[in-house]
Amino acid sequence: SLLLWIIILTIFSFLFLIINKHHPKNYRIYTLIIQNILILGFLFFVLFNSNPFSSITPIPNEGLGLNPILQDPALAIHPPLLYVGFVGSSIYFSAAMASIITNYSGKFFSQSIKNWVLVSWSFQSLGILVGSIWAYYELGWGGFWFWDPVENASLLPWFAMTALLHSLIVLEKRNLLYFWVIILCLLTFILSVTGTFLVRSGILNSVHTFANDPSRGLYILIFLTLMIFGSVL
């Protein structure tokens, strides 16, 4: 799943490079530098702590296979939709930091990220909706919404995205709430990575916890701390 995360990160970076050509060069360069730092951090995590190509020793004669409750067509749609929503927020996280560095603010900054916020918000909303429908007909899952810790972790970035969308309208039309927009840009991706940490670390008991490892959770926690520290600076 982290490979998918990195692929989506890379795609968003490439699309930003192509689509945002009319914005200042320094702003675009700093956005891509920060985006590449994020990609590098997750690449290190995959290579040294969660390599999907590492061999299993001893080789099991018969593997356990996929968890039965995950053997559903909806599960081919639900996680990728959420991932696009989560990872899509990295673009405006990087853009917000680039905006502070280059002093590129106001309605022009709002216009540069508004469509990216709309895309990630739309995919996040669809991901939550598909997951809720699947949870409803999956026997014993608890209805449309279970208020499970991991479910709530996916909802928090959605709230931040929704607030950000409304704030961007004010910034674009009235040139107000710039610092509030910056905070929401940073907060959305931080909450997305926090959700990844909660799922991977096993720190919380959750019906969504299918693969967890405390050592992997520690790496993500360190990465998350560095992100927050870098954002504050």
Go through each PLM region and give its residues.
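Polytopic transmembrane helical bundles with strong interfacial aromatic enrichment
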Residues: 1-233
